[in-house]
């Protein structure tokens, strides 16, 4: 749907900071950044040197060699947390990225908009033509009146000329009136056709929204192998990247996740994924706490090995980190085909009572240390206010950011279009608005802020990623 600029907001960063400077290696200058929201003091982060390794063979939790195939047992029907119906007890269920009907509607949107635009242009043309004809008629009438006055003052020899002019005036008037009437009829017909078409579109959109709001059911077989998390499944023999059931503890019911068994050694539980903009990430606190989106969909061969667009839930993310210290991996790709990553050896959100406050340590990768160091293009307080470590989770209805706490007009989540661990406001915004093509502008954003799927240390404020995924894996001692 079309978005309009609500208003020109205040700059998010302190443009008067004397120590703001541009990073020569960045693709974006400081002038292109959203310099805003000054912070009186910085954040000091203690980063103890951490290393991690997998257990040696024979030790506890070591990866066993792949077990010999066993006869496949009938899989127990498990209650689906996503709301889909299990067609059979031995079939898994996973929801696709988007419904086919929604995709078809999106394909038809641009042609319909183009036709509407052309109809509007025709309407404008008819209105302008009518105005010109009305102006011409008034001018002609004035000329006739002038001539009449002149003829009245002259001799009777000019009476015939006067009658001829009047007759011609009547002819022109009749012609103009008939033309205007025809134009008005044409305009009325066009408007009625346009109104009917828009009504049909509104009804179709309403129907598609109702269909797409319900979880979609797919006939994908979920592998029998399971575990506490994807790393556990990897050690139990699961080697393909697809949807699995996990059960982090005995007190919780199993639920579906997408496991990345290939990237950076495999065993990653994907807790967030952005691929096509099919899911709206501007959600409230309770929705982020639970789960939303589509975990995965099939490839036509009854295998759910294509990840969808979703958020696994802050409650679930916290649950995964209670049993083991977790690493976090951010994989991202741009619209030109390049990919980078950012990995942190320790990732720990606190519980809901603490606002799921985030703590990360020990960065590695080539995307830039956005969570611990903030946006490297900025300096001083402008940079400090973009650090995410130590921040609470915020949504548009739960303002926990560090931007003038208590002031409802200063709200990062509302302006940046997603839920995240905002400071004042961000160097990374994985849950922001999805923009096709990468580059976007202030005019496209609702509040004029950099609200895209952003990782500033790689592509700056005004480039939205094509793909962004957040993955967890236990860090073994």
UniProtKB/Swiss-Prot annotation:
Primary location class: secreted
Listed Basic residues bias regions: 44-55
This protein's GO CC annotations: fibrinogen complex
Modified sites of kind Sulfotyrosine: 13
Cell compartment(s), UniProt: Secreted
Entry keyword set: Blood coagulation, Coiled coil, Disulfide bond, Glycoprotein, Hemostasis, Secreted, Sulfation
Cystine crosslinks: 220-304, 230-259, 412-425
Gene Ontology terms, MF aspect: extracellular matrix structural constituent; protein-macromolecule adaptor activity; signaling receptor binding
Residues with glycosylation annotation: 27
Gene Ontology biological process: blood coagulation, common pathway; fibrinolysis; platelet aggregation; positive regulation of heterotypic cell-cell adhesion; protein polymerization
Region (Disordered): 1-76
Free-text description of this protein's post-translational modifications in UniProt: Conversion of fibrinogen to fibrin is triggered by thrombin, which cleaves fibrinopeptides A and B from alpha and beta chains, and thus exposes the N-terminal polymerization sites responsible for the formation of the soft clot. The soft clot is converted into the hard clot by factor XIIIA which catalyzes the epsilon-(gamma-glutamyl)lysine cross-linking between gamma chains (stronger) and between alpha chains (weaker) of different monomers.
Matching InterPro entries: FIB_ANG-like (IPR037579), Fibrinogen-like_C (IPR036056), Fibrinogen_a/b/g_C_1 (IPR014716), Fibrinogen_a/b/g_C_dom (IPR002181), Fibrinogen_a/b/g_coil_dom (IPR012290), Fibrinogen_CS (IPR020837)
Domain (Fibrinogen C-terminal): residue spans on this chain: 221-476
SMART domains the UniProt entry points to: FBG (SM00186), Fib_alpha (SM01212)
Subunit structure: Heterohexamer; disulfide linked. Contains 2 sets of 3 non-identical chains (alpha, beta and gamma). The 2 heterotrimers are in head to head conformation with the N-termini in a small central domain.
PANTHER family from the UniProt entry: FIBRINOGEN ALPHA CHAIN (PTHR47221:SF6)
Domain notes: A long coiled coil structure formed by 3 polypeptide chains connects the central nodule to the C-terminal domains (distal nodules). The long C-terminal ends of the alpha chains fold back, contributing a fourth strand to the coiled coil structure.
Functional description taken from the UniProt entry: Fibrinogen has a double function: yielding monomers that polymerize into fibrin and acting as a cofactor in platelet aggregation.
Name assigned to this protein: Fibrinogen beta chain
Organism, scientific name: Petromyzon marinus
